[in-house]
From Swiss-Prot:
Domain of life: Bacteria
Protein name: Mannonate dehydratase
InterPro entries: Man_deHydtase, Xyl_isomerase-like_sf
Organismal lineage: Bacteria, Bacillati, Bacillota, Bacilli, Bacillales
Broad enzyme group: lyase
UniProt keyword Lyase present: yes
Described purpose of this protein according to its UniProt entry: Catalyzes the dehydration of D-mannonate.
Pathway(s) it belongs to: Carbohydrate metabolism; pentose and glucuronate interconversion
Family membership noted in the UniProt record: Belongs to the mannonate dehydratase family.
Cross-referenced Gene3D superfamilies: Divalent-metal-dependent TIM barrel enzymes (3.20.20.150)
Naturally occurring in which organism (per UniProt): Geobacillus thermodenitrificans (strain NG80-2)
Cofactor list: Fe(2+); Mn(2+)
Biological process, per Gene Ontology: D-glucuronate catabolic process
One term of GO molecular function: mannonate dehydratase activity
Length: 371
């Protein structure tokens, strides 16, 4: 298991690589090029500059999150061909820089969706939260205004200004697009890009929808175990993989997260994992919490145990954290609580490794634990 940390770059992040370097166990940075519009080719020289910054601080850059998919591809428009060719070239350029995994999603228009970016918890921290009634009572444009107002001036991943400026025409284009249509468009996309990824030694890793249900009437197709099976079977290749996110899938209590992790880990199709906890309320609303199992509705200990039992060799990162100790940062992406999350996850992993060594009669010093 390779521990990583998402970093938005020196121009977009309050968290520095120097600070991330002080978190024990972090080996790599999960990064992206945020100045390149969605659908355009990522220039090799820009990728190499990002890699240089990351390597200079002792980290690897082997996971990219995300190379976002242009709406024309999701809509299945004739113009998708240009954007698919651009995507292929971006894959090739990333492979030249040593990237191994590309995380992406296939959510129409909106990426992750929340009603609040700073809901106050009983302990005084603030978190991302989703209240269904609030979302149902506003229109998409109001949602955009709320997200922008709550972003503390930061660019939020998945909420690119160039896309959100065309919100009304986009909704008109999606009128009548069904889940089956969206699945067909994803299949076409995968049939085009997976062979390129395979040639380049890269694993594509689709991220679940967040939350895992329809928002504003838009179709969602990456929401449960059955959806994930369909996607894996669209193109039977190791390069067609999954990003398993406990918090995204876990927002629906019908999703058995340890079972989902166990099933796809056994298939060898999970190169990347996000772990976070959420508290699900009786009415279906949810809010994010610390990573501790007892603080939310998900059994993080059991999830890490499944990773350990599966001999997970891929990449993992703590997902959204609370805003604590007066930190002012991009909502969900401060330094302190994500660092706490890493120590919790590694603590569980180290404990499992220690028990494994005891069973095997190995008294090797704990410093030899590989994470």
């Amino acid at each position: 298991m390779k521990m990583t940390f998402r970093w938005f770059g020196k121009d977009y992040d309050t968290v520095s690589l120097d600070h991330i370097r002080q978190i024990p166990g972090v080996e790599g940075i999960v990064g992206a090029l945020y100045h390149i519009p969605v659908g355009e080719v990522w220039p090799l020289e820009d990728i190499l500059e990002l890699k240089r910054q990351v390597n200079k601080n002792g980290f690897h850059l082997e996971v990219i999150e995300s190379v976002n998919v242009h709406e024309d591809i999701k809509l299945g428009l004739p113009s998708r061909e240009r954007y698919i060719e651009n995507y292929k070239q971006t894959i090739r350029n990333l492979s030249k820089a040593g990237v191994k995994v590309i995380c992406y999603n296939f959510m129409p228009i909106f990426d992750w969706t929340r009603s609040d970016l700073a809901k106050r918890r009983p302990d005084g921290s603030t978190v991302l939260a989703y209240e269904k009634q609030k979302v149902e009572q506003i229109d998409p444009e109001e949602m955009i205004r709320r997200i922008e107002n709550g972003a503390n001036g930061f660019l939020l991943p998945g909420w690119e200004p160039e896309r959100l400026k065309t919100i009304k025409p986009l909704f008109a284009l999606y009128k009548g697009v069904t889940e089956d249509d969206l699945l067909d468009h994803l299949r076409y996309f995968l049939e085009q890009i997976v062979p390129v990824a395979e040639e380049c030694g890269i694993q594509m890793a689709i991220h679940p929808d967040d939350p895992p249900w329809s928002v504003f009437g838009l179709p969602r197709i990456v929401t449960n175990k059955e959806n994930l099976k369909k996607i894996i079977n669209m193109v039977n290749s190791p390069a067609n993989g999954l990003t398993l996110c406990s918090g995204s899938l876990g927002a629906n209590p019908d999703n058995d997260i340890p079972d989902i992790f166990r099933y796809f880990l056994r298939m060898g199709r999970v190169p990347f994992v996000h772990v976070r906890n959420i508290e699900i309320h009786t009415n279906g609303d949810f809010e994010e919490t610390s990573h501790r199992s007892c603080d939310g509705s998900l059994n993080i200990c059991e999830i890490v145990k499944v990773l350990h039992e599966s001999d997970f060799q891929g990449y993992i990162r703590p997902d959204h954290g609370r805003m604590i100790w007066g930190e002012q940062a991009r909502p969900g992406y401060g330094l302190y609580d994500r660092a706490l999350g890493i120590m919790y996850l590694l603590g569980i992993w180290d404990s499992l490794e220690n028990e494994k060594r005891k069973r095997e009669g190995d008294k090797t010093c704990s410093q030899s634990i590989q994470v």
